[in-house]
Amino acid sequence: RYLLKPLVALFDKLIFSKVRENFGGELKFFIGGGALLDKNLQKFYVGIGIPMFQGYGLSEATPVISSNGPELYRFGSSGKLVKPIELKICDSEGKELPVGEQGEIVVKGENVMAGYWKNPESTAETVKDGYLYTGDLGYMSKEGLLYVKGRFKSLLISSDGEKYSPEGIEEALVE
């Protein structure tokens, strides 16, 4: 470990400092979303001194549901919930699941839309008792971090009833 310090310092001086300079030299961290961020890409940015944190949000509950930040982050996680959002994870019947179990991400808060413009049918399917059923698959960890795993509505069901996310299969194939 002690032998790595001089190498890291050398790489920082020759390479990483120039990358940071291309970002203006003042960037402390940045947050990405819109799709799941690649863990290796996140690790690269942490390594060069500009951490890339993953967040989660959607148009129907704008702008942010959860985010990692400098004080707490885990690769692969979408971070802690922003206040005052309520979040629960539900099964396909809408029953709340315990911490650690995967299901549909369901949110409630002042940021949740009232409904879709001139589309009461879609609104009734998506917003129930003030809760927005996002259609996204995820779980909450014991630490209170949200993990988004893919789309709940596009799950593949095996012959034994096990549910698989296409994104998880794609990730396994890429690795």
Where are these regions (language model features)?
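Glycine-rich phosphate/pyrophosphate-binding beta-alpha loops
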Residues: 34, 113, 166
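Glycine-enriched catalytic-core subsegment of oxygenase/oxidase enzymes
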Residues: 158-160, 166-167
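Repeat-solenoid scaffold signature
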Residues: 167-175
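Active-site phosphate/pyrophosphate- and oxyanion-stabilizing loops and adjacent acidic/basic residues
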Residues: 17, 76, 121, 171
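Gly/Ser/Thr-rich phosphate-binding loop
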Residues: 1-73, 86
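Conserved ATP-binding/catalytic segment of the ANL
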Residues: 81, 88-90, 95-100, 106-158
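Generic, well-ordered alpha-helical scaffold segments in large soluble proteins
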Residues: 22, 33, 44, 48-51, ...
